[in-house]
């Protein structure tokens, strides 16, 4: 399965977990913790040990299962390869591979800001900028932050619990 920038925007895909809603035979469950996010392709995966589904971003392997739980911005394409991929990609690809490519700052320049809002005081911001300085040198910087107040109510304190805060960035 192959998704490009147009598909991702059209289908409102904002995270690795969102991919499983549109790619057949790919299942990335939400166990409630970012540390135990696992991926399954055609029913093959591992929740406890090393993952059976590989994740590569710009040809760099992400070997930990927690890598499957992040939001992204500036994605050029996502390719899901099903079946054993060990010959080309090595370990942790027994079930398949999720291969993500980001936009190259040499090919696309500009800046972008995305804001999101939702229930339970959810809000997020993502910003990116790409600049080309010479024909051979360009850079891209992006950052994101997201938080919510949680949707569980602690009856003792009368306050919401289960709040989440996450952020990240990338320099290319």
Task: Enumerate the language-model features and the residues they cover.
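N-terminal periplasmic "start-of-domain" segments of outer-membrane beta-barrel proteins
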Residues: 1-8, 37-38, 53
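A general structural signal for stabilizing positions within well-ordered secondary structure
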Residues: 10, 17-20, 69, 88, ...
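Short beta-strands and strand-coil junctions in structured, solvent-facing domains, enriched
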Residues: 10, 26-29, 46-48, 62-64, ...
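Short acidic/polar hinge/loop motifs at secondary-structure boundaries
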Residues: 58-84
